[in-house]
């Protein structure tokens, strides 16, 4: 099998995990999420307790295999407190790098309680996961605000509407219910 360098962003100058030495072997299990330009976003196991999500050269795919294009958003956000960024949100949460309070980032996607972000430029460019709660979204109009809060939200304290869960609908209305 082959081994491929793994980068945190689709850019060979971006930060790499494992102190700059992150690699994946085609002998092991590799989950492919999708393609972005000449890159594949993949996840692979390092140990049973540690995985990594990152980018490899799309030539790693067998010629008869196809990967869908990644559908990532690009929403400006600001980090509201110092936080670690990880390339393994589901298992070890090993830090890839750190962000300080008030750092501007671009939110690309979300997965459970984690948001996939991009920050930095050139050799300090990276993508990784931060807890969604650390981000302050930048909202410029009401329609954007309504889109940003679509879905159901669990309320843990301080609900003045006597509901444990709020659901925000696309038309801007909301409903609340006791769960």
Where are the regions that the model predicts?
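N-terminal glycine/threonine-rich, aromatic-flanked beta-hairpin/loop signature
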Residues: 158-179
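A short, polar/charged loop/turn motif at coil->beta-strand junctions and beta-hairpin connectors
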Residues: 71-73, 79, 168
